[in-house]
Amino acid sequence: MNINEKHISEAEDWISKAIEADKRNGMMFNLGQDYAAYAELFKRKGDTAKAKENLSKAIEIYKQCGSDGWVEKAEKELKGLSRKK
């Protein structure tokens, strides 16, 4: 995610809207991508707990979609977050 710090709250609003729309429209893979983007945003804000929470949601959705490559990528990211205290 390539955004300036001043645009983080705007990005958070757009990601939240994307999550609502993808839930409403049953776009599960896109919903997983939304949660992964949200995790990255929280990671940039320094909120590791929320980053982990959203990445875990993305992983579960990717598993439901059978997106093994994305599961693997997100699990590696989650392990990296877990190492940071």
Regions found by a protein language model. Name each.
Residues 1-85:
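Helix-coil-helix junctions within alpha-helical repeat/solenoid scaffolds
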